[in-house]
Design a protein with these regions (language model features):
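Acidic, divalent-metal-coordinating active-site segment for phosphoryl/phosphodiester hydrolysis
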Residues: 107-113
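Non-catalytic, usually N-terminal nucleic-acid engagement modules in DNA/RNA processing proteins
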Residues: 102
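Alpha-helix N-cap/helix-start capping motif
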Residues: 82, 106-107
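Domain-level signal for Mg2+-assisted phosphodiester chemistry and nucleotide/NA-binding surfaces
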Residues: 1-93, 98, 114-118, 122
Length: 123
């Protein structure tokens, strides 16, 4: 999130790139976002049939995170980033979100964060 303050009753969407984010950092992300508002939308994106996402398994249930299945369409290519970006834009233009949290170690989401900020919302 930016250093820009939002209301305590703000609606926040947390979008997790489970393919490229460590579940070890989830608690700290939830803590920071929880101080900024209410995390009403919690989604984790990935190909849940992969063993590499096993660490996310119990956390999704414990923290009411909706696992969003995205199969790999082509070998060696992940469609997860595209799915997450489309969902973020849908949420942005619906107008019911006051801020976003994007959890990923993938710099591919930088243009998405910039675009959301252009619309006046913190990321």
């Amino acid at each position: 999130m930016t250093d820009r303050r939002i209301d305590a009753d703000a609606n926040i969407a947390l979008l997790i790139d489970a393919d490229n984010a460590s579940p070890d950092h989830l608690d700290s992300v939830l803590l920071v976002l929880g101080e900024l508002g209410t995390i009403n939308i919690r989604r984790a994106y990935g190909n849940w049939s992969k063993t590499s996402l096993k660490g996310w398994g119990t956390l999704t249930g414990e923290h009411s995170i909706l696992p969003m299945q995205q199969f790999d369409v082509t070998k060696g290519k992940s469609a997860t980033d595209m799915r997450m970006t489309i969902d973020a834009m849908d949420l942005l233009y619906r107008g019911n979100v006051d801020g976003f949290g994007i959890m990923s170690s993938d710099s591919d989401f930088l243009p998405l964060a910039q675009r959301i900020r252009e619309e006046g919302l913190p990321v």
